[in-house]
Amino acid sequence: MDPQSAIYTLPRVPTAAPTTGGVSWSHVGEVAILSFVALICIYLLYLWVLRDLILVLKARRGRSTEELIFGSEAVDRRHPIPNTLVPTAPVHPGPFVPGQG
């Protein structure tokens, strides 16, 4: 081979190895990563939007947000939960009562 033609010939580069049948691992990795990201997005959407939307829709159906029932904690409306904020003993206003003294 003369030096003049050696300049214009391309070097031999090995071709890529033939692929075997089946799914490549890079494709499996992409699907796994995208599934994980989608799961995180759905969870954050639930935390930030859907949970509040469910509360609003239940409140619009006639229940206040304090009366929402989760699971088997149903309360009989004929016998509601007593109000615990009502004092059981008489309340004394203290030493500084207006109009006395």
Curated annotation (Swiss-Prot):
Belongs to the mastrevirus movement protein family. It comes from Maize streak virus genotype D (isolate Raw) (MSV). Involved in the viral transport within, and between cells. Keywords: Host membrane, Membrane, Transmembrane, Transmembrane helix, Transport, Viral movement protein. Interacts with the capsid protein (CP). Part of a MP-CP-viral DNA complex. The chain crosses the membrane at residues 30-50. It is found in: Host membrane. One of its GO terms (biological process) is transport of virus in host, cell to cell. Pfam families: Gemini_mov. One of its GO terms (cellular component) is membrane. This is Movement protein. It is a single-pass membrane protein.
